[in-house]
Swiss-Prot record:
Location within or outside the cell: Cell membrane
Membrane topology designation: Multi-pass membrane protein
Pfam families: Pmp3 (PF01679)
Functional description taken from the UniProt entry: Plays a role in the regulation of membrane potential. Could mediate a proton leak.
Major location category of this protein: membrane
Lineage, highest ranks first: Eukaryota, Fungi, Dikarya, Ascomycota, Saccharomycotina
Family per record: Belongs to the UPF0057 (PMP3) family.
Protein's gene: PMP3
Record InterPro entries: PMP3
UniProt name for this protein: Plasma membrane proteolipid 3
PANTHER family: HYDROPHOBIC PROTEIN RCI2 LOW TEMPERATURE AND SALT RESPONSIVE PROTEIN LTI6 -RELATED, UPF0057 MEMBRANE PROTEIN ZK632.10-RELATED
Spans through the membrane: 3-23, 34-54
Keyword field: Cell membrane, Membrane, Transmembrane, Transmembrane helix
Gene Ontology cellular component list: plasma membrane
């Protein structure tokens, strides 16, 4: 799977602020809200979920 420039940008944003990376990829879907909860509970789970969402879609 080839990465585009926007994918790399979203990955960098996801490391800094995970919910924003998910929002840029999926919009205001359930993945966004799940990521907000995971980021509040722990920063690392939020990053892992954000990277999963970005790399999957």
């Amino acid at each position: 799977m080839a990465f585009t420039c926007s994918d790399i940008f979203k990955i960098i944003i996801a490391i800094i602020l995970p919910p924003l990376g998910v929002f840029l990829e999926r919009g205001c879907a359930s993945s966004f809200w799940i990521n907000i909860v995971l980021t509040i509970l722990g920063y690392i789970p939020g990053i892992i979920h954000a990277l999963y969402v970005i790399l999957k879609y």
